[in-house]
From Swiss-Prot:
<keyword id="KW-0963">Cytoplasm</keyword>
<feature type="binding site">
    <location>
        <begin position="190"/>
        <end position="192"/>
    </location>
    <ligand>
        <name>substrate</name>
    </ligand>
</feature>
<feature type="binding site">
    <location>
        <position position="247"/>
    </location>
    <ligand>
        <name>substrate</name>
    </ligand>
</feature>
<dbReference type="InterPro" id="IPR000023">
    <property type="entry name" value="Phosphofructokinase_dom"/>
</dbReference>
<dbReference type="GO" id="GO:0006002">
    <property type="term" value="P:fructose 6-phosphate metabolic process"/>
</dbReference>
<dbReference type="InterPro" id="IPR011404">
    <property type="entry name" value="PPi-PFK"/>
</dbReference>
<dbReference type="Pfam" id="PF00365">
    <property type="entry name" value="PFK"/>
</dbReference>
<keyword id="KW-0460">Magnesium</keyword>
<keyword id="KW-0324">Glycolysis</keyword>
<dbReference type="InterPro" id="IPR035966">
    <property type="entry name" value="PKF_sf"/>
</dbReference>
<dbReference type="InterPro" id="IPR022953">
    <property type="entry name" value="ATP_PFK"/>
</dbReference>
<comment type="function">
    <text>Catalyzes the phosphorylation of D-fructose 6-phosphate, the first committing step of glycolysis. Uses inorganic phosphate (PPi) as phosphoryl donor instead of ATP like common ATP-dependent phosphofructokinases (ATP-PFKs), which renders the reaction reversible, and can thus function both in glycolysis and gluconeogenesis. Consistently, PPi-PFK can replace the enzymes of both the forward (ATP-PFK) and reverse (fructose-bisphosphatase (FBPase)) reactions.</text>
</comment>
<dbReference type="GO" id="GO:0003872">
    <property type="term" value="F:6-phosphofructokinase activity"/>
</dbReference>
<comment type="similarity">
    <text>Belongs to the phosphofructokinase type A (PFKA) family. PPi-dependent PFK group II subfamily. Clade 'B2' sub-subfamily.</text>
</comment>
<comment type="subunit">
    <text>Homodimer.</text>
</comment>
<keyword id="KW-0808">Transferase</keyword>
<keyword id="KW-0418">Kinase</keyword>
Length: 419
């Protein structure tokens, strides 16, 4: 069969395992070199396609590509750049098709979250209208775990493991010092609309009274009086209180506790730090000495503590994306399907992008305790397998060894395009 080229791009916030998906895509393409010629990657995501800034991944060694599996962040560069509505910004989509046509790219693998799924779907639709034979596959990725259809999202399991571990270790620290020093510790985690990462912090507690004593979810309206009462109860009973709070914690009217008033490139509200906001409330209302921390980029970059389950799944969806494309399944996403909890078993199936794009999966109410401050056993059964297993990177000079890519650029064939 005729050879055609493939294009891969990373989108949005990166994770500890998105490069494992890249590894899965690239290695699968190399195994099918009778049908796929060169593999190009967009420098800084979809912007690389629009500006024709392409990296020739085919020139990277097998060893360098294999090292992507244990390298965090986005090896080819990512971006927060959302292609707008196709009717009013058609030129951007047409530009993508022009670049793909110029470089004989027939396979488009877009690795990202919900917004990326929407872009992938639109590109697929426009290429069909323009008569260009393009197969577009979305490769799932998001630490927020809010993609629908898939049982869980690659990237989440490793963040969950990091947050659960950090909560456990910080709790021991606070417990050691609470008699004469800090009484309250607040850990802020990612999760704008969905509280999956905050929920993972609850895995640190194995029995009644174990920290974290409060988990604050975006799905539960923030009640200041109720929160303060629970904090005070915990300090009186245990001597200290550990709180895991989602960055998206909000009041009943939908206002974020830490709304900065700004928006990002995707139109999402930018949040200004719920941990110091909540800690300040506790100091004002109860007078307790506190410390707070924001996990921020650390939680999604911690490849040294990645979940093996997450690494395996991230690689598998990348690999499956290529299989779907070669099978002619256009506008699809490889989705993880859970077969059983104990023993944990899973597989990867194809999901229509139309069912994924611009939809969010929130914490079910029966995953959150009735009082709103913790997780249920049902939630624990769901989360526990996702943090299982260790997949340590190789170390050199005491530090993790990461992939070093040559990133040879492809010669441009088209006129310059202004974003």
């Amino acid at each position: 069969m005729a050879q055609h080229n493939a294009f891969y791009a990373q989108s949005g916030g990166v994770t500890a395992v998105i490069n494992a998906s890249a590894c899965g895509v690239i290695e699968a393409c190399r195994r099918h070199d009778d049908r796929i010629g060169k593999v190009y990657a967009g420098h800084n995501g979809i912007i690389g396609a629009l500006t024709e800034d392409l990296i020739d991944v085919s020139q990277e060694s097998d060893e360098a590509i294999a090292a992507l599996r244990h390298t965090p962040a986005g090896a080819f560069g990512s971006c927060r750049y959302k292609l707008k509505d196709i009717e009013t910004h058609r030129t951007q989509y047409e530009r993508l098709i022009e670049v793909f046509r110029a470089h004989d790219i027939r396979y488009f693998f877009y690795n990202g979250g919900g917004d990326s799924a929407d872009t992938c779907l639109k590109v697929s639709q426009l290429s069909e209208k323009m008569g260009y034979p393009l197969t577009a596959i979305h490769v799932p990725k998001t630490v927020d775990n809010d993609l629908p259809i898939t049982d869980n999202s690659p990237g989440f399991g490793s963040v969950a493991k990091y947050i659960a571990t950090s909560t456990l270790e910080a709790s021991l620290d606070i417990a050691s010092m609470c008699a004469t020093s800090t009484k309250v510790f607040v850990l802020e985690v990612m999760g704008r609309h969905a509280g999956w990462i905050a929920a993972a912090g609850a895995l640190a507690g194995q029995g009644e009274g174990d920290p974290p004593h409060l988990v604050i979810f975006p799905e539960i309206d923030f009640d200041r009086a109720a929160v303060m009462a629970r904090v005070e109860e915990s300090v009186k009973k245990c001597g200290y209180c550990v709180i895991v709070v989602s960055e998206g914690a909000r009041y009943e009217d939908g206002t974020f506790l830490a709304d900065s008033g700004n928006t990002d490139a995707f139109g999402h509200r930018q949040l200004g730090g719920v941990a110091p906001t909540l800690a300040g409330m506790i100091k004002q209302d109860l007078g307790y000495k506190y410390h707070w921390a924001v996990a921020d980029y650390l939680q999604r970059a911690a490849r040294h503590l990645a979940s093996k389950t997450d690494v395996d799944q991230a690689y598998a969806v990348g690999e499956k994306a290529v299989e779907l494309a070669l099978d002619g399944q256009n506008a699809k996403m490889p989705a993880i399907k859970r077969i059983s909890d104990e023993p944990y078993a899973w597989t990867v199936e194809a999901a229509p992008l139309a069912d994924v794009a611009n939809r969010e999966k929130f914490m079910p109410r029966d995953f959150i305790r009735e009082d709103g401050f913790g997780i249920t056993e049902q939630c624990r059964r769901y989360l526990a397998p996702l943090i299982q297993g260790e997949d340590f990177p190789p170390f050199e000079n005491g530090l993790p060894k990461v992939a070093k890519l040559a990133k040879h650029r492809v010669e441009r064939k088209l006129p310059e395009f202004k974003l």
